[in-house]
Design a protein with these regions (language model features):
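Juxta-kinase regulatory segment immediately upstream of eukaryotic protein kinase catalytic domains
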Residues: 2-46
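Short, N-terminal intrinsically disordered low-complexity segments that are rich in Pro/Gly
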Residues: 17-25, 48-51, 73, 77-80
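Broad hydrophobic/π-residue packing in well-ordered secondary structure
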Residues: 24-27, 34-42, 60, 74, ...
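Short secondary-structure boundary/capping elements
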Residues: 27, 51-54, 116
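ATP-binding glycine-rich phosphate-binding loop
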Residues: 39-64
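ATP-binding pocket architecture of kinase catalytic cores
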Residues: 65-141
Length: 141
């Protein structure tokens, strides 16, 4: 299993300016228990903060008896339900056409997003990997 230091993303990136002091909110234990109880993912073995990707979205790596998952709470302002549903439809279509995407996990009621206390949560099957290296000129083609 990766250590906490392995989950710190130090990759320089282009995009919205976020200073180094920006820290993702955390998902507290109560919210974590409520949201995860909405999924059939087996018994929980370990949960750790996952700090890669956007620092604005709280993420937790959840290891269970059925596998590893990434729980993500959408950042405020990036959580419009219509946009999330659209993004999930795109991911589903890509998956059906055999594109390698982290699969969304459906909740017990068949949804791919959970609305809890006005916040939007998503659960993905966790895939180990590395950030794309776009420094290779051939990759730009």
């Amino acid at each position: 299993m990766a250590t906490d230091s392995d989950n710190i993303d130090r990759t320089p990136r282009l995009g919205p300016l976020v200073d180094d002091t920006t820290v993702a909110e955390e998902i507290d234990g109560r919210d974590l228990a409520i949201v995860l109880s909405r999924y059939d993912i087996g018994s929980i073995e370990r949960i750790v903060d996952y700090r890669k990707g956007s620092r604005r979205a709280a993420k937790m790596l959840v290891r269970t008896s059925k596998g590893s998952y990434l729980l993500k709470r959408r950042a405020a302002g990036r959580d419009d339900q219509n946009q999330v549903v659209f993004a999930h439809a795109v991911q589903h279509t890509l998956s059906q056409h055999r594109f390698p995407v982290a699969g969304l996990v459906e909740s017990l009621d068949g949804n791919t997003l959970i609305d809890h206390d006005g916040r939007t949560y998503e659960l993905f099957r966790f895939i180990h990997g590395h950030r794309f290296d776009n420094s290779n000129p051939a990759a730009a083609e």
